[in-house]
UniProtKB/Swiss-Prot annotation:
Record keyword Ribosomal protein present: yes
Protein name: Large ribosomal subunit protein bL32
NCBIfam families per record: rpmF_bact
GO cellular component terms given for this protein: large ribosomal subunit
GO biological process: translation
UniProt keyword list: Ribonucleoprotein, Ribosomal protein
InterPro entries: Ribosomal_bL32 (IPR002677), Ribosomal_bL32_bact (IPR044957), Ribosomal_zn-bd (IPR011332)
Family membership: Belongs to the bacterial ribosomal protein bL32 family.
Pfam family, one: Ribosomal_L32p
Residues covered by region (Disordered): 1-26
Coiled-coil region: none
Length: 56
């Protein structure tokens, strides 16, 4: 089994963890239906940028 030779420093640990942070999802509110959705995605109703794009 691999065993480290030297203890990694706080700096190296921090550099490794620098990409581990989570980002919040960018949400938008549709101007017609008022529904919350992900940016650049359609709403559950089928609206995108105030227009009905999926008709059921």
């Amino acid at each position: 089994m691999a065993v480290q030779q030297n203890k990694p420093t706080r700096s190296k640990r921090g550099m490794r963890r620098s990409h581990d942070s989570l980002t919040t999802a960018a949400l938008s509110v549709d101007k017609v239906s008022g529904e919350t959705h992900l940016r650049h995605h359609i709403t559950a109703d089928g609206y995108y940028r105030g227009r009905k794009v999926i008709v059921k």
